[in-house]
């Protein structure tokens, strides 16, 4: 279990300290009267933000300009990744979720129609049987399908898809780790094709990164979503060229409605089994590579290893459902049919499915809460892992006080969980302590302090949930980076409050990368 409680860092703190501290006279002598007058003037005070703030701050405090202001880039791509809504806006979240579902359904249908024969040949006729069950019309007198068998086939097919994707990616990882002279013909071709995609991404990102403003946290945009997804897909199972025709495991699952059938029959929601279209670690490698230079193989391997970790979590989750939950569901089916005296035991009764429903607040997503009072400033994320891992963590922010609280939480007990007993601290204990400690911080206004103490006695307001595409361990690492890296905090905590909240959520879901600072002499030449 880990716990971190910290003050957040913002730009401007060192400037204020330098102008009012006991060392001011020494600094004034060093930098001269002109710079001091500028910093203390109304115009200077207003302008000490972003790039100008970084310049003045570095002069006043003697810091390296490059260490003062860097360019911050969120490691997702607009159009290709999920665009991040304001976490405190359930309406924005709902619209984005619905649009995403419709897009995925459309792409899945295109893949199923175009590659159906190849897919069935490789993964078996069970896929087709599950799809026909999902779309078939009920007819009187036609023999009813054994729903438990359909459920087993859907889970087995999904397991085969994740296994195939994992295997192909593992092949690419091994090929990249070899010297080019040691690669087989197939491995060389695989690496060459992958590198061509990476170069396409790199070219697009370089065009965009030249326009990234030093004073703002940015997202990468520029290529259309289809082209980006096509470029980012390491090893498509079939097809290629345009994203809508790439048969990835994600697209095949959607096309044959595997998750929908599993959820409809058993109540088991597997919507959290996802992989990012573009791996954040791969974007980081591209951003770190010098312009016009080739990205090192080992840097690309890191991105692939993160995706393998993500796929491993998904595979283990499907295995957990198959090995631990399905036998229990079969027993529950028999019990429930006996109870109502129904001999048609091919059906999974709604009562049986409801036994395996997981409460909304314990599903493997980022659960979002706000304080009952001062909700715009005080909000929390409850990050929950896959069912088989059974871990969770708490991340709370008070933007008014510039305060953050992180804590690893208890293992949940529920129908799909792996925990045999509940251990550790609960969400209630974590948010109560968060409110209590925030209220004790120096500088808290009397009204804000009262509201924090009052909030401690009430449950936070539940505002919805966001899926995350990366592995839970990577999500935790992102949270700890936000908590412990003062440079990252300075870039996240800028702009309007809704922009700050959105940046924090994106940094948690996708990660954030700080690029190098801008040369001070170059800036002053054009200032």
Curated annotation (Swiss-Prot):
One of its GO terms (molecular function) is structural molecule activity. InterPro entries: Capsid_VP5_Orbivir (IPR000145). Its main location: virion. GO terms for biological process: symbiont entry into host cell via permeabilization of host membrane. It is found in: Virion. The keyword tRNA processing does not apply. Keywords: Capsid protein, Outer capsid protein, Viral penetration into host cytoplasm, Viral penetration via permeabilization of host membrane, Virion, Virus entry into host cell. The keyword Hydrolase does not apply. Residues 1-42 are annotated as: Involved in membrane permeabilization. It comes from the Viruses. GO terms for cellular component: viral outer capsid. VP5 protein is one of the two proteins (with VP2) which constitute the virus particle outer capsid. Acts as a membrane permeabilization protein that mediates release of viral particles from endosomal compartments into the cytoplasm. Permeabilization activity is probably negatively regulated by VP2 and is triggered by endosomal degradation of VP2 and exposure to low pH. Belongs to the orbivirus VP5 family. This is Outer capsid protein VP5. It comes from Epizootic hemorrhagic disease virus 1. The gene is Segment-6.
């Amino acid at each position: 279990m880990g716990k971190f409680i910290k003050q957040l860092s913002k730009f401007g703190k060192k400037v204020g300290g330098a102008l009012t501290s006991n060392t001011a006279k020494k600094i004034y002598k060093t930098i001269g009267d002109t710079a001091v007058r500028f910093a203390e003037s109304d115009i200077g005070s207003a302008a000490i933000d972003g790039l100008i703030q970084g310049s003045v701050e570095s002069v006043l405090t003697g810091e390296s300009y490059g260490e003062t202001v860097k360019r911050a880039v969120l490691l997702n791509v607009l159009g290709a990744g999920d665009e991040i809504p304001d976490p405190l806006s359930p309406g924005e979240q709902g619209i984005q979720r619905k649009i995403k579902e419709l897009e995925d359904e459309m792409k899945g249908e295109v893949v199923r129609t175009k590659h159906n024969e190849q897919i069935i040949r490789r993964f078996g006729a069970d896929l087709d049987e599950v799809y026909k069950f999902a779309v078939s019309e009920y007819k009187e007198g036609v023999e009813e399908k054994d729903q438990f068998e359909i459920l087993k086939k859907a889970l087995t097919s999904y397991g085969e898809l994740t296994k195939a994707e994992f295997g192909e990616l593992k092949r690419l990882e091994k090929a990249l780790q070899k010297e080019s002279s040691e690669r087989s013909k197939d491995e060389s071709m695989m690496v060459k094709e992958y590198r061509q995609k990476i170069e396409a991404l790199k070219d697009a990102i370089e065009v965009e990164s030249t326009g990234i403003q030093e004073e703002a946290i940015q997202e990468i945009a520029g290529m259309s979503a289809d082209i980006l997804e096509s470029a980012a897909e390491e090893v498509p199972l079939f097809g290629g060229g345009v994203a809508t025709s790439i048969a990835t495991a994600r697209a095949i699952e959607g096309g044959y409605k595997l998750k929908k059938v599993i959820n409809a029959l058993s109540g088991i929601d597997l919507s959290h089994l996802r992989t990012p279209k573009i791996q954040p670690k791969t974007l980081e490698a591209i951003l770190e590579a010098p312009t016009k230079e080739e990205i090192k193989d080992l840097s690309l391997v890191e991105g692939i290893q993160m995706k393998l970790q993500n796929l491993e979590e998904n595979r283990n989750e499907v295995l957990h459902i198959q090995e631990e939950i399905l036998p229990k569901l079969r027993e529950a089916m028999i019990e429930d049919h006996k109870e109502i005296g129904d001999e048609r035991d091919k059906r999974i009764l709604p009562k049986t499915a409801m036994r395996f429903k997981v409460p909304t607040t314990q599903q493997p997503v980022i659960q979002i809460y706000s304080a009952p009072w001062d909700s715009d400033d005080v909000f929390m994320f409850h990050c929950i892992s896959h069912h088989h891992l059974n871990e969770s963590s708490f991340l709370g922010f008070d933007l008014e006080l510039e305060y953050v609280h992180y804590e690893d939480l208890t293992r949940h007990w529920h129908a799909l969980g792996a925990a045999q007993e509940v251990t550790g601290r609960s969400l209630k204990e974590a948010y109560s302590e968060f409110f209590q400690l925030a209220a004790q911080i120096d500088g808290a206004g009397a009204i804000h302090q009262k509201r924090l103490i009052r909030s401690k006695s009430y449950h936070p307001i539940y505002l919805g949930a966001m899926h995350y595409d990366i592995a839970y361990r990577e999500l935790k690492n992102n949270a700890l980076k936000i908590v412990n890296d003062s440079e990252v905090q300075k870039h996240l905590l800028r702009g309007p409050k809704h922009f700050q909240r959105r940046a924090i959520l994106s940094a948690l879901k996708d990660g954030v990368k700080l690029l190098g600072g801008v040369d001070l002499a170059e800036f002053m030449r054009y200032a």
